[in-house]
Amino acid sequence: MAYQLHYWPTIQGRGEFVRLALEAAGADYVDVARLPARQGGGETALAPRLGDPGNPRAAFAPPFLVDGDIVIGQTAAILLYLGPKLGLAGIGESDGLWTHQLQLTIADAVAEAHDTHHPISTGDYYEDQRDAALQRARAFREARIPKFLNWFEQVLQRNPSGDLHLVGDVLTYADLSLFQLVDGLQYAFPKAAARALANTPAVVKLHANIRRRQRVHDYLQSPRRIAFNEDGIFRRYAELDG
């Protein structure tokens, strides 16, 4: 039975981290909301699962994954579940926990990237909080992007198995998620990302290697890969970069 991924159909967002894992593993999955409405797709397909009174463990918000009777929300939790099944969580419990820790750190970085354009309220337009966004983005560019990427550089450099992967010598969902984080930063903050990446050669190498993996490469070239846009987490506003 195919996995069912439920996420907004027009953005990469947090669902993209799950998509990348499924695609890299060659897993059978359905991106439900991207199906035509006549096939049960569209954004309206998300609401019944989220508001299902018969499910005491319904997800708070997309993304969520359905695998038979199991419904899992939160990107990191979905990947914690999928990782061992897809062979993307390293070898053994210790690798699995380390992979999860890396994913949670990536989630922190993603949340901070989002807050650069919505620093006050997610319910207000960017234009209504632009002054605060300029201040938040400056701190993110100057301090937080380098801090996150430098830490991942250290993880790669200190990996006893070499600097090609974050965990051991095998591909994990943390590698794929770091690829997506770097891709997003390069889109939203091209100048700031370039400065930080100039000091993190192992991160740059991992990003390039992931892009060259056949399944990932094919996915990135396919219509299944939604382009970055200004409705997602990583948004390009020139005034926020520098």
Residue ranges of each PLM-predicted region?
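Acidic/histidine-enriched, glycine/proline-rich intrinsically disordered or flexible terminal extensions
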Residues: 223-242
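Residue-level recognition of oxygen-bearing side chains
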Residues: 77, 202, 215
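Generic N-terminal initiation segments characterized by hydrophobic and/or small/turn-forming residues
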Residues: 76-79, 85, 146, 153, ...
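GST-like domain detector, emphasizing the conserved glutathione-binding G-site
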Residues: 1-138, 237-241
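GST-like fold's C-terminal all-alpha helical module
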Residues: 94, 101-212
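C-terminal anion-handling pockets and recognition modules
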Residues: 217-222
